[in-house]
Structure formats: C-alpha cells, structure tokens
C-alpha cells in the first residue's frame, strides 16, 4: 500500500540499523522517503530524529501507516533514548501535514526533547491518544485558515502534551501558557 506524498526523515547521530528500521517503515507506506543525514547542530543531544509524515494526524494516519509500523518506530525511539542516557540523549520531532478529520491544514509537530528517560517514553507513548484532543485544543488559537504550523511540547510536570506555539502566514506567533491557559502573541 502506498500513500500519496513523500515522507521526510532527517537525522544525526543514529546507528545504521536505526536508520534502516525507520526508513523501511516509511518507505513501506509512502514509497518515497526524503532521507538526509544532518551535521550535529545541538551539542546537548547526541542524536536527533525528525520524521515528517505526508498525511494529516488522525485516525486515518494510524489506519494507513498501521499500528505495527507505529509501534516499531515508537519502540525504536524509546530504545534509542534508553541506550543514550539522560544527559546527552535524543531529541525527536514527529510532524504531520495537517490534522484530520477537520481538514486543519497547519503542519503539526510533536517536539520531544525530554532529558528524563521515563518522560521521553511517556511522551512518545501518548501521541496516538491525542487524535480526538488536538482538534478541540486548536480552538484556543485564532482562526486556523492562515496558521502554518503548530508545535506541541510534552509537559513533564503534568504528564501531558500541550500546544506550545502556533505560527501564522503573516509572521505572527502565539504561545500557549498552560498554567494560566492563556495565549501570548509575540
């Protein structure tokens, strides 16, 4: 089964077998993978993985990509983090070309930069459970028709994903403040 579009897989500091596992999971569904090894850009992390799926985040993604492939990628990311330890571990960016079923078009990015192994694992584990929550959370931001990107961060204190920042085509940025549940425009 081949889905439309090309998946993106950029990385640094990961082993050949890790590259092969992620690449084959993406290629098996999307057919084409934009793979790129980057120079180390952040000395705080020995490894970085960025995966961009060419379909929107939602139930349809998990049907097309399959839970088996999703579990394989999740398991690999968690194992990479465990092997590299907490101090200089792994950062991961998992992104989608929109949010389904509402046809929300901004790129959705899950940014996983937790230093603590357990929090990293919990963040990865909880992504699939956000399918019904994210469309509701999007309502806190101004109109999504000119929103280009929304970034989610994992909150280690409250053990949940929160919207962090939304970027708009006019250059404006909104930051969500989870403690006060307010938006701040930058």
Regions found by a protein language model. Give the residues of each.
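Short hydrophobic alpha-helical membrane-entry/anchor segments
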Residues: 55-72
């Amino acid at each position: 089964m081949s889905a439309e579009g090309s998946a993106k897989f950029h990385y640094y500091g990961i082993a050949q077998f890790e590259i092969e596992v992620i690449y084959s999971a993406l290629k098996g569904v999307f057919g084409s993978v934009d793979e790129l090894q980057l120079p180390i850009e952040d000395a705080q992390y020995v490894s970085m993985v960025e995966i961009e799926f060419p379909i929107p985040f939602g139930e349809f993604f998990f049907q097309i990509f399959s839970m088996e492939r999703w579990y394989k990628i999740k398991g690999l990311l968690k194992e990479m983090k465990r092997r590299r330890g907490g101090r200089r571990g792994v950062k991961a960016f998992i992104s989608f070309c929109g949010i389904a079923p509402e046809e929300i078009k901004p790129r959705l990015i899950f940014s996983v930069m937790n230093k603590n192994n357990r929090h990293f694992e919990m963040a990865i584990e909880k992504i699939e459970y956000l399918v019904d929550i994210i469309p509701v959370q999007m309502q806190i931001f101004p109109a999504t028709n000119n929103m280009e990107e929304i970034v989610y961060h994992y909150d280690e204190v409250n053990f949940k994903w929160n919207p962090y920042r939304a970027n708009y085509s006019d250059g404006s940025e909104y930051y969500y403040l989870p403690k006060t549940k307010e938006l701040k425009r930058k």
